[in-house]
């Protein structure tokens, strides 16, 4: 069932993702990364698909910039906040799949599994 949003929410959905993605881009160009891996292991972004990434919530801003435009499929909550996040990361080149523990979680995981089996990169947050 499609979500319905109040006028205030629709305005926020039209504005916030644009501003948030612009802020991520502005901050992202100032970030420097150091890949720390075992010498025999490829860094995560060099791993051929399908692969699963797990990100800590506290690292989402840096991860959104680092892994932008890779077509990574992300499981995102069906809440209003999740809608803001989904629209923001889609502007950065991610694919959003919706589902959470309280709203369509099983369907979200099944869709994430389908994306993985189709050969896509997938991501979850911890």
Regions found by a protein language model. Give the residues of each.
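Conserved Motif II region of HX4D acyltransferases
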Residues: 49-52, 111-126
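Residues forming well-ordered secondary-structure scaffolds
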Residues: 18, 84, 107-111, 117-119
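Short, basic, glycine/proline-bearing loop/turn elements
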Residues: 23-25, 95-98, 123-126
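Membrane-anchoring hydrophobic helices of lipid-metabolizing enzymes
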Residues: 1-70, 86, 113
């Amino acid at each position: 069932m499609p979500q319905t949003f109040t006028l205030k929410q629709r305005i926020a959905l039209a504005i916030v993702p644009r501003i948030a993605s612009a802020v991520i881009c502005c901050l992202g160009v100032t970030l420097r990364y150091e890949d720390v891996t075992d010498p025999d292991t490829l860094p995560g972004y060099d791993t051929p698909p399908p692969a699963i990434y797990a990100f800590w919530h506290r690292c989402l801003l840096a991860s959104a910039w680092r892994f932008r435009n890779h077509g990574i499929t992300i499981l995102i909550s069906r809440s209003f906040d999740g809608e803001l996040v989904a629209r923001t990361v889609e502007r950065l080149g991610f694919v959003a799949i919706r589902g959470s523990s309280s709203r369509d979680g099983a369907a979200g995981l099944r869709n994430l599994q389908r994306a993985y089996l189709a050969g896509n990169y997938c991501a979850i947050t911890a």
